[in-house]
Amino acid sequence: MSDVQVHQLYIHGRYVEATSGKTFNSINPANGEIIATLQQASEQDIEAAVKSAQQGQKIWAAMTAMERSRILRRAVDILRERNDELARLETLDTGKAYSETSTVDIVTGADVLEYYAGLATAIQGEQVPLRESSFFYTRREPLGVVAGIGAWNYPIQIALWKSAPALAAGNAMIFKPSETTPLTALKLAEIYTEAGLPDGVFNVVQGAGREIGQWLTEHPVIEKISFTGGVETGKKVMASAAGSTLKEVTMELGGKSPLIICEDADLNRAADIAVMANFFSSGQVCTNGTRVFVPKSLLVDFEKAVVERVKRIRIGDPMAEDTNFGPLTSFPHMEKVLSFIESGKQQGAKVLIGGGRATEGELAKGAYVLPTVFSDCTDQMAIVQEEIFGPVMSILSYETEEEVIQRANDTTFGLAAGVVTQDISRAHRIIHQIEAGICWINTWGESPAEMPVGGYKQSGVGRENGLTTLGHYTRIKSIQVELGDYQSIF
């Protein structure tokens, strides 16, 4: 324990001692070892972060959009220079394969920051003539101080997805990372400061989600909450935000997304997409296509093709370059996923491959769950209805297009969906009837910076990324101007 570094809070451009006197540990899920100890924020610390953010935001908003853009672009350059270093830290903290964190997590997060840095100068109002002597114009003004609450599966990417549009629009952000994977958010704060961000514009306060989340959502100064996490927690955050000061919210919540394989689909492509849609990042992706609908005529061949591909997955030490499937992010989460797998077995689903914990050699020390594929699934099974957030694919057979659309939509979730077919008319026809906010045709999973992402139904409120999100971090002020005489009726 003496070699374990203790991390403080990051407030006003520097590390500061938390006042709670409490700490918690970050655990490497590949072997169960403690990799860091973190101080936990108190309500007093949240107040300090808010005051700091208020001060920094005034300075930040007073800068020209071009000045803000240049600072954010510097942060992008630093992120890319330190890609490998940040990726190694992300792998230690999350258990995700380094082959993934080094090519996806930091890269795509930096892409989003670069995108919004470029848009900072594009925030503008409009001018509308009313008559010869009068017109009105609008201003898009920053909200002020906003808060981001991150999830544990994509720590630095989520921190960037939330902070990039907020900062580009002239706001300050207080960010609370997941207590399971808090380390790279602190590194991001350092990078923002190094790039020239005024002190207080990006503060990081880590600790227990229930306490800190409540303090942030109820704080009267904070104007918006952007939350990524589970549905039930999201409902509480939204209720708290509305019940305190009618805060604006963005909610990126859970999913149980359908992947529809059509009868004319290329079998190899369909199997490749299904495996990526379920086992990338060890299955810990909110948009995973965990309900795979397959025509009965293709079922046997499709299952065989999927199993062949799952056998090629390389499970191992996440720091090893050839590993493409690491442990789950925490041991408690591993137990939750294993309980779902047992539920699937008990409810009559057939295990085609996997079906338990990986215990061979060094894997026994980590939170490893074997990539698992269930067949003979029904819509009523828990593994089909509930978000597992792990490497568990459920294959369901269907007969008609009308049937599969109805069943795909028969869920309280609506985050993502996909269709695999060689008939482009069919692809659009099906997708247009699917109740989901992010859809893919003949591919899966890519979320470029330019594309708005978010869910229907209980999968979320609002969007992240894309041009539309920038507007969500501003408010519109309307100003009418009268150049002529003013006539009173009194």
Swiss-Prot record:
Single Gene Ontology MF annotation: metal ion binding
Pathway the protein takes part in: Amine and polyamine biosynthesis; betaine biosynthesis via choline pathway; betaine from betaine aldehyde: step 1/1
Domain of life: Bacteria
Keyword presence, Transport: no
Residues of the active site: 162 (charge relay system), 252 (proton acceptor), 286 (nucleophile), 464 (charge relay system)
EC number from the UniProt entry: 1.2.1.8
Residue numbers bearing the Cysteine sulfenic acid (-SOH) modification: 286
Necessary cofactors: K(+)
UniProt KW keywords: Metal-binding, NAD, NADP, Oxidation, Oxidoreductase, Potassium
Classification via InterPro entries: Ald_DH/histidinol_DH (IPR016161), Ald_DH_C (IPR016163), Ald_DH_CS_CYS (IPR016160), Ald_DH_CS_GLU (IPR029510), Ald_DH_N (IPR016162), Aldehyde_DH_dom (IPR015590), BADH (IPR011264)
Alphabetical list of SUPFAM superfamilies matching this protein: ALDH-like (SSF53720)
Annotated positions binding NAD(+): 150-152, 176-179, 230-233, 254, 286, 387
Catalytic function, reaction form: betaine aldehyde + NAD(+) + H2O = glycine betaine + NADH + 2 H(+)
Enzyme's top EC category: oxidoreductase
Site (Seems to be a necessary countercharge to the potassium cations): 248
UniProt GO BP: glycine betaine biosynthetic process from choline
Cofactor-binding details, from the entry: Binds 2 potassium ions per subunit.
Annotated K(+) 2 binding sites: 246, 457, 460
Annotated positions binding K(+) 1: 26-27, 93
Function: Involved in the biosynthesis of the osmoprotectant glycine betaine. Catalyzes the irreversible oxidation of betaine aldehyde to the corresponding acid.
Record note on quaternary structure: Dimer of dimers.
PANTHER family named among the record's database cross-references: ALDEHYDE DEHYDROGENASE-RELATED
Family named by the database record: Belongs to the aldehyde dehydrogenase family.
The protein's name in its UniProt record: Betaine aldehyde dehydrogenase
